């Protein structure tokens, strides 16, 4: 009886101490949006972007946050292949073929 109690207690302790996988994003990855490398990142209300928004038919008042300009996707992070010689950002909307990306947040690829 004492042996059975010991076995049950030991198994319960092992089960409680077993590590579980955490679903946290890796360094240099985006929890929302896509990882992009943009030549410049500017505020949406920047005067230099106003004419570009007009050409794309975007209403300036509807755009908030940071805007990436001339962006390309970063595909390999952490394997020595992720390089961005400009500004790495996570962007929510890159539906303008890399010309601009909307809703960007700067990130650090060197973590």
Curated annotation (Swiss-Prot):
It comes from the Eukaryota. GO terms for cellular component: extracellular region; fungal-type cell wall. The keyword Cytoplasm does not apply. The keyword NAD does not apply. Disulfide bonds join 30-90, 37-84, 38-71, 91-104. One of its GO terms (molecular function) is structural constituent of cell wall. Keywords: Cell wall, Disulfide bond, Secreted, Signal. It holds the Pfam family Hydrophobin. Coiled coil: none annotated. It is found in: Secreted; Secreted, Cell wall. Residues 1-17 form the signal peptide. SMART domains: HYDRO. Self-assembles to form functional amyloid fibrils called rodlets. Self-assembly into fibrillar rodlets occurs spontaneously at hydrophobic:hydrophilic interfaces and the rodlets further associate laterally to form amphipathic monolayers. Belongs to the fungal hydrophobin family. Aerial growth, conidiation, and dispersal of filamentous fungi in the environment rely upon a capability of their secreting small amphipathic proteins called hydrophobins (HPBs) with low sequence identity. Class I can self-assemble into an outermost layer of rodlet bundles on aerial cell surfaces, conferring cellular hydrophobicity that supports fungal growth, development and dispersal; whereas Class II form highly ordered films at water-air interfaces through intermolecular interactions but contribute nothing to the rodlet structure. This is Class I hydrophobin 10. The lineage of its organism: Eukaryota, Fungi, Dikarya, Basidiomycota, Agaricomycotina. The gene is Hydph10.
